[in-house]
């Protein structure tokens, strides 16, 4: 099953996540099909907290990809911010 989930990056105590489309059997930070955005939970000031390619996210959801709980919340938040 294809899922849209977060892959952790960044450094210790400073997380940074990529929104990735991947096969659910792959490791969290392992192989992915496509990166469709990022989420920076510790962004401050002028830093961008969330960026999502809405067009690609809609495409993958249309193809049957299942978003994780957190990603579903982030996609809703990103759609609200662009509207």
UniProtKB/Swiss-Prot annotation:
InterPro entries: Ribosomal_bS16, Ribosomal_bS16_dom_sf
Keyword entries, A-Z: Ribonucleoprotein, Ribosomal protein
GO molecular function per UniProt: structural constituent of ribosome
GO annotation (BP), single: translation
GO CC terms in record: cytoplasm; small ribosomal subunit
NCBIfam families: S16 (TIGR00002)
Family note: Belongs to the bacterial ribosomal protein bS16 family.
Protein's recorded name: Small ribosomal subunit protein bS16
Organism: Azotobacter vinelandii (strain DJ / ATCC BAA-1303)
Name of the coding gene: rpsP
